[in-house]
Swiss-Prot record:
Maturation-removed propeptide residues: 188-207
Topology of the protein relative to the lipid bilayer: Lipid-anchor; GPI-anchor
The protein's name: Placenta-expressed transcript 1 protein
GO biological process terms, semicolon-separated: cell differentiation; negative regulation of cell-matrix adhesion; positive regulation of cell migration; wound healing, spreading of epidermal cells
Glycosylation sites per record: N67, N122
Post-translational modification: N-glycosylated.
A Gene Ontology cellular-component term: extracellular region
Signal peptide (UniProt feature, chain positions): 1-25
Record function comment: Modulates leading keratinocyte migration and cellular adhesion to matrix proteins during a wound-healing response and promotes wound repair. May play a role during trichilemmal differentiation of the hair follicle.
Organism lineage string: Eukaryota, Metazoa, Chordata, Craniata, Vertebrata
Keywords: Cell membrane, Differentiation, Glycoprotein, GPI-anchor, Lipoprotein, Membrane, Signal
Name of the encoding gene: PLET1
Length: 207
């Protein structure tokens, strides 16, 4: 009877052990679906893009430097309100706020990712964030900004007007007339007295 009891308990124990292992493995796979980073380094890795001018619905190629210690790159794009924007194409794993690209070649030096800007939503600037996930170190964050190209009218509106650019107006009196001024000068009493004195002196000298 004891032998039969042991024969029943042994398979049951193995089944329970296997169930616990499968449950743990399933939990690990679920928790690692999306990367979240509480700690990371912020270092400039010279991220490049096919264009630094932001345009709605455009597709950009983003190049991130990697090495043999990097096994994944997590890409994220934020608008001016820190909301997720656009779509990362052909990613190995897409999440709500980021997308993951795995480095499948240990000799790879640059990882290329494609990002599509959203439809027009009054967005004038976005920040591309790249987290390089390393095997035995904290992830490294590098950023790159794309800005909308300013139009000529918008650029002119930003230039302050100084006094050098203000129009110059010459103010002249409207009621001044030279002829009237001459008549006033020659018709004054002093002028008449001078004329009389000159006439008297002239007549005295002649006679």
């Amino acid at each position: 009877m004891a032998v039969f009891h042991d024969m029943l308990l042994q398979p049951l124990g193995m089944f329970l052990c296997l169930s616990l292992q499968l449950s743990s493995a399933t939990f690990i796979r679920y928790s690692s679906t999306c990367f979240t980073f509480d700690e990371y380094y912020t270092i400039t890795l010279d991220i490049k893009a096919s264009s630094h001018i932001y345009e709605s619905n455009a597709v950009y190629s983003v190049f991130v430097p990697v090495n043999d210690s990097v096994y994944a790159v997590v890409m994220k794009t934020l608008d001016e309100n820190s909301d997720s924007a656009g779509l990362w194409q052909r990613a190995d794993k897409n999440c709500y706020s980021n997308s993951t690209y795995y480095v499948k070649d240990q000799y790879m030096t640059v990882l290329e990712a494609q990002w599509q800007a959203p439809e027009p939503e009054n967005i004038t600037e976005v920040e591309i964030q790249a987290f390089t996930v390393q095997i035995r170190a904290l992830p490294i964050l590098s950023t790159l900004k794309l800005r909308e190209k300013l139009s000529t009218l918008a650029l002119a509106a930003k230039i302050p007007q100084s006094s050098a650019f203000k129009p110059f107006f010459m103010i002249t009196p409207k009621s001044i007339r030279l002829e009237g001024l001459a008549n006033q000068v020659f018709s004054s009493p002093i002028t008449e007295a001078i004329y009389i004195l000159l006439a008297f002196l002239t007549s005295t000298l002649l006679f």
